[in-house]
Amino acid sequence: MARVTVSVLKDKKKRKEKISMLTAYDYSLAGMVDEAGIDMILVGDSLGNVVLGYDNTLAVTMDDMIHHSKTVVRASKNAMVVGDMPFLSYHISKKEAVRNAGRFIQEAGCSAVKLEGGSERVDTVKAILDAQIPVMGHIGLTPQSVHQFGGFKVQGKDLETAKKLVEDARALDQAGVYCIVLECVPSELARRVTEEISVPTIGIGAGPYCDGQVLVINDMLGMFRGFTPKFVRKFANLEPLIMEALKNYKAEVEAGTFPAEEHCFTIKEEVLDRLY
């Protein structure tokens, strides 16, 4: 089976088939996500929160993203791997944006990049597309703008911001993005956007009417001890299982019951006798 492509995703929207996406940041989990048949793996700058321990995503660098993206690409065979462009990697100039987007493709082996912002990012999006690099848009709550928004808040609840969201979606669609993430917006507004634009929408906290869904894998597996957003469903609760395993390991090491005989290698007695 070949990797999922832009055309595959667009065909899914036409057939009204839902698109699945999850984040992943390491070889082990990325391999499992791929084997499960998830359409896209986003190497998200959310690794700043769930992997690197920052309060937000703003401290994540291009080198951080390339390092983790390489790992995810090596682990996956079928999913489209999308590299998330971090803060300031596409804000300074179009030239720098293209160079950084190119690193995700050339160095890491990703199939596409994602960047945040609406109408104000159209020229940047077009420049990256001119370099033959597929671009995923991201509007609504854009975490790299957390200080501008005054925190992590639902977007598009009043007429002015709802109109802005629709305009941004139209602008990105016309610019040529292959899909758009809608984050933390009212469900009915997300439905309007999804019905209006030609490319798939991927929701995170945007209700059931989007063409697809994405979650942070650490959240949906119940592995992250930090804040869990309202829109997250824990499909597993692994933290207590992991904690139990860690405590059992400690107890068995201290009691001398691990490693047991079945975990050990042997050597012939005559070899030992000839050591000294």
UniProtKB/Swiss-Prot annotation:
Its EC number is 2.1.2.11. 3-methyl-2-oxobutanoate binds at D45, S46, D84, K114. Pfam families: Pantoate_transf (PF02548). Its cofactor is Mg(2+). Keywords: Cytoplasm, Magnesium, Metal-binding, Pantothenate biosynthesis, Transferase. One of its GO terms (molecular function) is magnesium ion binding. Belongs to the PanB family. This is 3-methyl-2-oxobutanoate hydroxymethyltransferase. The gene is panB.
